[in-house]
Structure formats: structure tokens, C-alpha cells
Curated annotation (Swiss-Prot):
Monomer. Belongs to the metallo-beta-lactamase superfamily. Glyoxalase II family. Pathway: Secondary metabolite metabolism; methylglyoxal degradation; (R)-lactate from methylglyoxal: step 2/2. The keyword Zinc applies. This is Hydroxyacylglutathione hydrolase. PANTHER family: HYDROXYACYLGLUTATHIONE HYDROLASE, HYDROXYACYLGLUTATHIONE HYDROLASE GLOB. It catalyses: an S-(2-hydroxyacyl)glutathione + H2O = a 2-hydroxy carboxylate + glutathione + H(+). GO terms for molecular function: hydroxyacylglutathione hydrolase activity; metal ion binding. Its EC number is 3.1.2.6. Zn(2+) 1 binds at residues 58, 60, 116, 135. The gene is gloB. Binds 2 Zn(2+) ions per subunit.
Length: 257
């Protein structure tokens, strides 16, 4: 039987996603990253929850700036990537790819997803069918390669697309509309992408959030995951290139978009 995980999602810091997860059985609550302590406190108050954990995906300031004020107020335990422990304020416990731990009734699997940063991780809760990818995989996009190579990011994305297609995807930023504009330059004849772009435009016109997505939806519409697609390969002039090279070219084009 699928266990119920309550999720509260909101936008803060202009385009960061704040995400709270709550296990109603144990009454435990965690925030995925801590972009804005004030916004997180307001969301907790709306739901009547108290904060127990911060699950850090990577060390960038817009994901950890709330760590210390939230720790001071709630006494939270901060979990984050072993490879970035020196850069994560207030960290209490380090984890790495392949590790597992429990959050209430839920098993949490840690996936190593470097590329955006050297030690970034994602948190996968199989019983809730949800993955939190930070700035590795976005709706219709992927993170910039600040501390990694295209090969590094490619292999991280390979791990994420191996998850079940009905896995819900939550990421770190509301970049989806701009990502859709770029995606249409790479994959303009993709009918699923065109329909999705229209829906995204409608949502954003009303200042509504475009997440969560799913792994299956991203595989059908996100050009950064469609390295196998023959039409995309032909458009890029990379019909016989390795998958990794196709991804690298798409990332290069996005950097210049």
C-alpha cells in the first residue's frame, strides 16, 4: 500500500521552490533545502507543522541560507552531501550516493547527482513515488555545469531517468517557462512538448506553479533527457554521436540561449 506523504510547495526568493514534506503518521516534517527561512516558517505556520529536518541537495547559497536561522529556531537536524560538508552551514549528518535513511515511515534513498555542483545529491522516496532533485534536473531543463563536466551531469541524469516513470519530480527553481522556450528550439515538432508549453504559459500567466512533473513527462518532453531521439540528433547534426555528446551539445546551446 502506498504511504501518504504530504507536500507543501511554494515559491520564494523570486524563483526558488520551497518544499516541505510531512509524514502524518510520525508528525515529522522536513524542508528540501532552506532557501528562505522566513518563507519556510510561514509555510509551516500555514500547515500547523514544526520543522525537524533539512535535507540539503547542494551547497549554493540560495539553497542553504536558511539553515542556521531554522536550526536556531527549531533545533533541526541538517542532512547533506558528504562531498560538500565544509560548505553547508550547520550540517549534522552527511550522506552519499547509495545511502538510505528513514524519515518517519518513509525510506529515503540518496542518489549521487553531481554536475551542477561537485557533490550534489537527490533524495528519492520510493514509497511516496517522489524524487527531489535540487538543481540537477528541472522541469524541461537541467542545471548549469558550475562544478562539473557534461559527462558528469549526463551520468547523473541517467540515474534519474532510471526511476519509475510515475515518480513525481520536485526541483529547486521555477524555470519552466524559459526552459520550454529553449526546448522548442531543439525539439519543435514534438507535439507533447508543444502542448506542455501551452499549459505552462497558461499556468504562469496566473502565477501558478508548474511542478510537480513526473519522470515520464520529462522523458517525453525535456530535451536534456532525449539524447536517443533521432529527430533531435538529426537537427543537431549528431546522428551517430554517443548519447553523451548529444547531451553536451544541447547543454552548450542552452548556455548560449
Amino acid at each position: 500500500m502506498e504511504q501518504r506523504l504530504e507536500i507543501e510547495q511554494f515559491i520564494c526568493r523570486s524563483d526558488n521552490y520551497g518544499v516541505l514534506i510531512h509524514d502524518p503518521e510520525s508528525a515529522l516534517t522536513a524542508t528540501i533545502d532552506a532557501p528562505d527561512a522566513y518563507a519556510i516558517e510561514a509555510a509551516l505556520e500555514r500547515r500547523g507543522w514544526t520543522l525537524d529536518f533539512i535535507f540539503t541537495t547542494h551547497h549554493h547559497l540560495d539553497h542553504v541560507e536558511g539553515n542556521e536561522p531554522l536550526k536556531e529556531k527549531f533545533g533541526v537536524s541538517i542532512i547533506g552531501p558528504e562531498a560538500e560538508k565544509a560548505k553547508i552551514p550547520g550540517i549534522d549528518r552527511t550522506v552519499k550516493g547509495g545511502d538510505e535513511f528513514t524519515f518517519g515511515l518513509f525510506k529515503v534513498k540518496v542518489i549521487s547527482t553531481p554536475g551542477h555542483t561537485a557533490g550534489g545529491i537527490s533524495y528519492y522516496l520510493p514509497d511516496a513515488k517522489v524524487v527531489f532533485t535540487g538543481d540537477t534536473l528541472f522541469a524541461l531543463g537541467c542545471g548549469r555545469l558550475f562544478e562539473g563536466t557534461p559527462a558528469t551531469m549526463f551520468h547523473s541524469l541517467e540515474k534519474l531517468v532510471a526511476l519509475p516513470g510515475d515518480t513525481a519530480l520536485y526541483c529547486g527553481h521555477e524555470y519552466t517557462q524559459n526552459n520550454a522556450r529553449f526546448a522548442l528550439t531543439i525539439d519543435p515538432d514534438n507535439s507533447a512538448l508543444k502542448e506542455r508549453a501551452k499549459e505552462i504559459a497558461r499556468l504562469r500567466a496566473h502565477e501558478r506553479m508548474t511542478l510537480p512533473s513526473t519522470i515520464a513527462l520529462e522523458m517525453a518532453t525535456n530535451p536534456f533527457l532525449r539524447w536517443h531521439d533521432r529527430t533531435i540528433r538529426a537537427r543537431l547534426g549528431l546522428q551517430d554521436a554517443p548519447d553523451e555528446a548529444v547531451f553536451a551539445e544541447i547543454r552548450k546551446r542552452k548556455d548560449m540561449f
